[in-house]
Amino acid sequence: MTKIPKYWTVAKKYLSKKDKVLSNLIKKYNSPSETVLTSRKDVFYSLCKSIIGQQISVAAANSVFLKFKKKCKNKINIKVVNKLNIIQLKSCGLSRQKAKGIKSLAKQTLNKTFNPKLIPRMSDEEAIIYLSQLRQIGRWSAEMILLFTYNRSNIWPVQDIGLLRAISKNYKKKYLPPKSFVDYLKNKHSPYCSVAVW
């Protein structure tokens, strides 16, 4: 894991001034043991984990991921994963579609049709579109990669159930909160939406 993003402290001060609700939440959770956004900076690892975790419980995802990690002999990298076949991947508990997604990811990364090194130079939207071209990776998954792997400062995943529930709870709105209000908060919290989401 890496250090906290450089923008973290500035973002908290900015959001505290802009939004009374967030100001109260930041004060509530502001402590030496505060959990902050960090990253392992390994996009291939993160994409594999993202594909594995789709549409299953956290417990199930963790179980499958541990089996996958063991199958990779604790070395989740492109060359190791590329040597695994679909049957080996399925034996970890992966569906055929997810196994194909991970195989495709390894192949595309090896032949450079997918090049993660290009992403830091892209805008958020360009990066989302680029990542979404990968098999088994949709917009929400791409946003999670930008948030948790690249630590982009202004990600606002409007399809995220956790975010929508948090908005409903903290801003006293019905669930689902109106799109107009979600968009209003995005504009209000920009350019530090990622910190607001966290």
Task: Provide a role label for each language-model segment.
Residues 160-175, 180-187:
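C-terminal end-helix/capping segment
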Residues 74, 107-115, 133-136, 147, ...:
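Alpha-helix capping at helix-to-loop junctions
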Residues 123-168:
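Catalytic DNA-binding helix-loop module of base-excision-repair DNA glycosylases/AP lyases
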Residues 1-122, 184-198:
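N-terminal polyanion-binding entry modules of DNA glycosylases/AP lyases
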Residues 94-96, 129-139, 171-177, 194-196:
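A short, terminal or domain-edge coil/loop segment
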Residues 48-49, 53, 86-90, 128, ...:
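Amphipathic alpha-helical segments within well-ordered protein domains
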